[in-house]
């Protein structure tokens, strides 16, 4: 009995072991199959992603080649058109000159025939008077130059008769030579001249042969056609060198003087009438139908920024700043300096927290966080190892070498000049001569700062190609994002707070997943990226400006290019130089861009947001071009209600623009160097009465400003 039970137990254990072995075998096969499939899946996925990236790069290269070829063809066509226009102009000028010469020759021949007929009739009907005494002249025509037998010629021995009561002059008939005109009776010529005066005032007569009138002696006291007085320079240029040139007689000169005086009298009232109109040129407003045009004059009040010459009603002046108001518009904004924050170096960027309570600034090696209400320093963030790592990365990396003139050259990209790539900070650095105090590698400028939506974290981008995520309260780095191959110039958080977009000189825009610290999407373009922005609300779109003068808008989920806003649009209203700042309007329907071409532009994106109708402009069109800055535009921002646009420039000024009309409302001069960065605060950190904005400058200052709307005077 016991043996039977034992055998049964052993058999059961064997069966269980067999089942266990079978289960383990199946599990191993399943794991092997899963791993193999996972590897195949990952391999195929990576291969497809690589192919997509290759296709995208190929498309971008083709696009770049197309643009270059198009530019070359357009330049060649431009030169050819210019050549054709010049040739047509020359042909037209020659045709007009030939016609005038023919008309003048016909008129001279007619005058000669009429005078010959009159003289012939007079000599046939009136007895010959006593011959006047012969006159000797150095300009008399030699006998060898005369020809006998001409039907209309007079004998050499005969002289013109003296006619009693006749209006004919008693002077002898001159020979018409090169650059001289045939004589006519004075009173008759004066009448003809007054009736037939035509421009140009100095008539050029085609040369005639000395044998036109046979035997007619020449005299120094000759008479010519009176003509309208020409400018002295014209007379000097057209004065013939022939000694036989005729002179204008006293009567002709009197007629000329009278005509000239009358002409001047007619011109002077026109000039006097134009003077009052010029007084109103200071009141220039942009015509509504020219809002998008790039070629517009700068409003006159912005041309001369000397506050001493401006009336008190059109300015506000203190020891630290002054404001010039547009005289053509009512004064509706009052701006005051709230706090001035001194820094040890150039302030490259300023950015408010989402609630507007804090302001972050970036300068050399450090990032500061200030409380807006009182300007107190909340935190100073600095990575002590950053400068050393930055220096080592430059000296140890074989693919990157540092050269003079602040130029970085890499083996995989084209040469990028720091001054061209980062005029915002580098222009100020050049002015301050910062690179003379230390080697370029010892500087580590914080190019961009951005608060997380909840205000707990701060992202910073710098020259060492790293993005640091700081815990503001603990003043510690919680994450470092690596992947860019050149300086990082711009950052922006997504509204959800779990993603970040960055733009770099390595010609890429990258979207980072902050939950994993990995790059989730890379967008490549043909030139360096200078600025990026995320659309408000859902963060559906990202915009980027670059050195190729274009603003691109992508779908942040798919990476598809939605819009390309540049000078190649149908209207030709795009930027003419590199774009250095972009920002979405608060409603997300438009993009504002600032460029080195000294302009600010407002681009319509309503069709891209699927909210367009027949009354709205086409997607991607430039609605307004704001002209007023006299140097590079380095930063742009919009107010909370999108009523105004602010722009900072290398001309040291901040302009308030009326968004709809395109007119500048005021110019704020509050810095002694380039205004590199401008930011507008959300909320009301200084109370409901004031709105707040901040500026960062190459004068090593960041300033917090407050403004409010006032009732028009």
UniProtKB/Swiss-Prot annotation:
* Family, as annotated: Belongs to the WD repeat TUP1 family.
Query: Record's PROSITE patterns?
Result: WD_REPEATS_1, WD_REPEATS_2, WD_REPEATS_REGION
Q: What is the lineage of its organism?
A: Eukaryota, Fungi, Dikarya, Ascomycota, Saccharomycotina
Alphabetized SMART domains for the sequence: WD40
- What does the record note on quaternary structure? Associates with CYC8/SSN6 to form the CYC8-TUP1 (or TUP1-SSN6) corepressor complex that is composed of 4 copies of TUP1 and one copy of CYC8. Interacts with histone H3, histone H4, MATALPHA2, RFX1, SKO1, PGD1, HDA1, HDA2, HOS1, HOS2 and RPD3.
What is the superkingdom listed in this entry's lineage?
Eukaryota
Q: What else is known?
A: Present with 5840 molecules/cell in log phase SD medium.
Bias type Polar residues, positions? 164-180, 207-226, 241-253
Q: Low complexity bias located where?
A: 124-153, 181-197, 254-264, 392-409
By its UniProt entry, which SUPFAM superfamilies does this protein fall under? WD40 repeat-like
Residue ranges, annotated region (Disordered):
124-278, 387-409
Return the protein name: General transcriptional corepressor TUP1
């Amino acid at each position: 009995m016991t043996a039977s039970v034992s055998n049964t137990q052993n058999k059961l254990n064997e069966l269980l072991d067999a089942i266990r072995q079978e289960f383990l075998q199946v599990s191993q096969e399943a794991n092997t199959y899963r791993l193999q499939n996972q590897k195949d899946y990952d391999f195929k996925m990576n291969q497809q992603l690589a192919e997509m990236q290759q296709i995208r790069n190929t498309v971008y290269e083709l696009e770049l080649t197309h643009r270059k070829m198009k530019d070359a063809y357009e330049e060649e066509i431009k030169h050819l058109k210019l050549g054709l226009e010049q040739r047509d102009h020359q042909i037209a000028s020659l045709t007009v000159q030939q016609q005038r010469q023919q008309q003048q020759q016909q008129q001279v021949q007619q005058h000669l025939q009429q005078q010959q007929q009159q003289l012939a009739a007079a000599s046939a009907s009136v007895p010959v008077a006593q011959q006047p005494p012969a006159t000797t002249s150095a300009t008399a025509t030699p006998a060898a130059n005369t020809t006998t037998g001409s039907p209309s010629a007079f004998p050499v021995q005969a002289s013109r008769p003296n006619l009693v009561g006749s209006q004919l002059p008693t002077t002898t008939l001159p020979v018409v030579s090169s650059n001289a005109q045939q004589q006519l009776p004075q009173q008759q010529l004066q009448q003809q001249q007054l009736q037939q005066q035509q421009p140009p005032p100095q008539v050029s007569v085609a040369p005639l042969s000395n044998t036109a009138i046979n035997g007619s002696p020449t005299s120094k006291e000759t008479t010519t056609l009176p003509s309208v007085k020409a400018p002295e320079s014209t007379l000097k240029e057209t004065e013939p060198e022939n000694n036989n040139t005729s002179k204008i007689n006293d009567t002709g000169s009197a007629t000329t003087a009278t005509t000239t005086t009358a002409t001047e009298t007619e011109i002077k009232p026109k000039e006097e009438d134009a003077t009052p109109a010029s007084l109103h040129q200071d009141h220039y407003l942009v015509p509504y139908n020219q809002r998008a045009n790039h070629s517009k004059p700068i409003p006159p009040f912005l041309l001369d920024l000397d506050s001493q010459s401006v009336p008190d009603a059109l300015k506000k002046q203190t020891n630290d700043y002054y404001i010039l108001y547009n005289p053509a518009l009512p004064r509706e904004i009052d701006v005051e300096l709230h706090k001035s924050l001194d820094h040890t170096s150039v302030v490259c960027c300023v950015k408010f927290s989402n609630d507007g309570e804090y302001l972050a600034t970036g300068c050399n090696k450090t990032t500061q966080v200030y409380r807006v209400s009182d300007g107190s320093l909340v935190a100073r963030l600095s990575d002590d190892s950053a400068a050393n790592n930055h220096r080592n990365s430059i000296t140890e990396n074989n693919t990157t070498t540092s050269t003079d003139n602040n130029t970085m050259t890499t083996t995989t990209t084209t040469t990028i000049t720091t001054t061209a790539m980062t005029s915002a900070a580098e222009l100020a650095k050049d002015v301050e001569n910062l690179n003379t105090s230390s080697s370029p590698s010892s500087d580590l400028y914080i190019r961009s700062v951005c608060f997380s939506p909840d205000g707990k974290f701060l992202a910073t981008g710098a020259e060492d190609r790293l993005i640091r995520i700081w815990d503001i309260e603990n003043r510690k780095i919680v994450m470092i994002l690596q992947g860019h191959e050149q300086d990082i110039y711009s950052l922006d958080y997504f509204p959800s707070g779990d993603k970040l977009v960055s733009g770099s000189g390595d010609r890429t825009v990258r979207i980072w997943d902050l939950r994993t610290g990995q790059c989730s999407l890379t967008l490549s373009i043909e030139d360096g990226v200078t600025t990026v922005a995320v659309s408000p609300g859902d963060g559906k779109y990202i915009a980027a400006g670059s050195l190729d003068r274009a603003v691109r808008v992508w779908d942040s989920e798919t990476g598809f290019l939605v819009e390309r806003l540049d000078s190649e649009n149908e209207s030709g209203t795009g930027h003419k130089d590199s774009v250095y700042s972009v920002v979405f309007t608060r409603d997300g329907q438009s993009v504002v861009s600032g460029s080195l071409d000294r302009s600010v532009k407002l681009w319509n994106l309503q069709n891209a947001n699927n909210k367009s109708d027949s009354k709205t402009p086409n997607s991607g069109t430039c609605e307004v071009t704001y002209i007023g800055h006299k140097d590079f535009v380095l930063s742009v921002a919009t107010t909370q209600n999108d009523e105004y646009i602010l722009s900072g420039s290398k001309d040291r000024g901040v302009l308030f623009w009326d968004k709809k009309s395109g007119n500048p409302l005021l110019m704020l001069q509050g810095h002694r160097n380039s205004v590199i960065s401008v930011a507008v605060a959300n909320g009301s950190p200084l109370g409901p009465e004031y709105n707040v904005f901040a500026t960062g400058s190459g004068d090593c200052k960041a300033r917090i400003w407050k403004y409010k709307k006032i009732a028009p005077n």
